[in-house]
Amino acid sequence: MTEGYKDDSDLCHTTAGLSETNLKRLALTEFDGGTRKGWQDTDLQLPVYKKNRDNEKFRFGEIYGRMFWDKPAPTITTRFYSLSNGRFGHPAQNRAISLREGATLQTFPLEYVFKADTISDISRIIGNAVPPELARRIGKAVLEATIENKAKGFAGGLFDGL
C-alpha cells in the first residue's frame, strides 16, 4: 500500500496523501519506531521544533514518527491517518497507517463496515470509540459480578453502597 491509496470498494483501505515535503520527511525517518529527531536536514524540521531538536524533552517528539512493530501502538486519535498528528507512520512503508489498520488496532472486527462517507468521518468514529474488545471485556466482568452477587443472595444492585 502506498501513500494516497484509495480502494473504491472499501474506503477503509485508504491512506492519506502526503506532500512532497512530508514524503521526504518520512523517507528520512528510520523504520520501526524512528522519529524526526534523526533528521539531519533541519530544513525539514518545522520552525517551532527546530530550537528544541536537541533538548532532552524533545517537544512533540512523536509527531512524524513511525510506529513500532513490537511495541504497543500509540493511542488511536481522531486524526490517526495523518502523519503530522502523532506517531502514525507505518513501521516500514512511507505512509501513515490506513483507516483499516487504525480500526484493527482499536479491535474493530475486520468485516466491520463504518457508516460514513469521508476519511475524516471514519477516522473520527474510530478514534472516539471505546475499543470494542475492551467494552466486551468490561461488560463480561460486570455481568459475571452481577451473577455472582445474585448467587450470594445480595439483594441490592451491583453499585449499592459505593
Show which residues each predicted segment covers.
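C-terminal target-recognition/interaction regions appended to catalytic cores
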Residues: 1-162
